[in-house]
Amino acid sequence: MTALARRAATVALVAALTACSGTATTPETSKAPSNLPPPLVPAMALPDNAVDNAVAKLDGIADELMKSSGIPGMAVAVVHGGKTIYAKGFGIKDVNRPADDPANKVDPGTVFQLASVSKPIGATVVAHQVGQKAISWNTPVVDKLPWFALSDPAVTPMVAVGDLYSHRSGLPDHAGDKLEDLGYDRRYILERLRQLPLDPFRISYAYTNFGLTAAAEAVAAAAGKPWEDLSEQVLYHPLGMTSTSSRFADFEARPDKALGHIRIDGKYQPLYKRDPDPEAPAGGVSSSVDDLTHWLAMVLANGSYNGQQIVAPDALLPALTPQIVSSPASEPAMRSGFYGFGFNVGTTSAARTQLSHSGAFELGAGTNFVIIPSADVAIVALTNATPSGIPETLTAEFADLVQFGEVREDWRKLYGDAFADMDKPEGSLVGQKPPASPAPAKPPAAYVGTYRNDYWGAATVAEKDGKLSVALGPRPDIFELTHWDGDVFTFSFVTENAPPGTISTARFDGDKLTLEYFDDDKMGTFTR
């Protein structure tokens, strides 16, 4: 299984786990009739002082998770009844700075990269535009982006904004992500989605950053301005989210920001910068928990904030309700998980609708929020470390405490196991020893040249001092080649989608070069 496939499976499992809060037997509820319609009645009442009691335990939960995981920093906030009732920072922003430096402490105003928590935030930008009649969830993307296409000419004119915001276009999991790793820009990547095979339209769920980004670009085109400006104008500014942006440069310029830390050999280090500008609508938002409480309060209030209607309720509702099954049940008694437009939508064992989303940057961000509308409560947790399930564990334990008065699952193990699979290195030679007596390679000159590929661009093989390298992408990225056996070489690297320890083969065959890591969908062969 490739890293992208593992990531897709992890995303689905995390969403399913989030929707399965609590499985123990629940006490019998009152038989008094309710004035609410049956679909609005939960299976059990909340415990007395449910939210306050849950909040009282957050310090201990957060401290224990920080200590046991070793992650550098985390910030947590809770919204209830339209107010922020908890906001606190834990740990530090940068392990290379003194831990006792007050300026290095995480606080509620510290800005983190949100990764895929950007998706539901962006969905509320789209919902605003839908409410303004500037666009519809059903608007075909090609109506606003005439250059956009998918590989099936029958699907291209039909695929709508909502299809891409619910991951039901048929595009493969994480389509285009590796192009981003190589440094290609948004337009280049979106134009190459047309080369990818499609699963059946509107009945296949596959999580895509650049599919969703295409939809956001259509919304921005309809508004006549860049997505980043539109988000600021219609959402961040009206909500008073002064530390929130969809531009990486703004995050870089923040004095109070948490650096991303990657885990290598069990230790966290701020070794890489993650610039998500090409997929800004899907993963490029940076914010603080202070700012995010404004957004959570708005979602809980059906689009209203401080007496101002930011998003029309009828435009927001489709985003918060099921649009496709994302985690099918494996047996009749099991609850399925769903995806709305940018939101995970599930039902807990207390029969309460739960909205959520996680964000995950391998290079150093793990984020999560949970909203329980019927309890009028939401929680968000942001971390500056390779995803390991810590924010999800905290929010799941809090959700259990709110609904049941106790934690009912070993969420740390469930989420830890799910994320551990995503962190495994990729490549068929991982863990293998080189051949004891490899077949000799040809002279370096036999391999040198420029090999071309319509999807990935050029791969330029060069020789220096008898050693070969391959250069890819517009920067370019240069990978040193190590001989393995005959015409097979290897290279190692770390990117957002290639965890530490990843090894790719580079296999030469005459005028053809196949790069294993880039051979998704059998598209990794370059021709000289």
Where on the chain are the PLM-derived regions?
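Short, solvent-exposed loop/turn and secondary-structure capping segments
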Residues: A87-F90, H174-E180, E232, S246-D250, ...
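Mid-domain, small-residue-enriched loop/turn segments at the edges of structured enzyme/sensor domains
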Residues: A160, F210-G211
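Active/ligand-binding-proximal structured segments within catalytic/core domains
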Residues: G122
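Secretory targeting and sorting signals
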Residues: T2-T23
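Catalytic loop of the DD-peptidase/beta-lactamase superfamily, centered on the K-T-G motif
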Residues: C20-A87, A220-Q233, H237, Y272-R528
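Active-site helix/loop module of the DD-peptidase/beta-lactamase fold
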Residues: K57, G73, P102-N104, P108, ...
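Short, conserved catalytic-motif segment at the N-terminal edge
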Residues: D48-F112, G131-S136, D143, S151, ...
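Catalytic nucleophile serine of serine hydrolases
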Residues: S116-V117, A206-N209
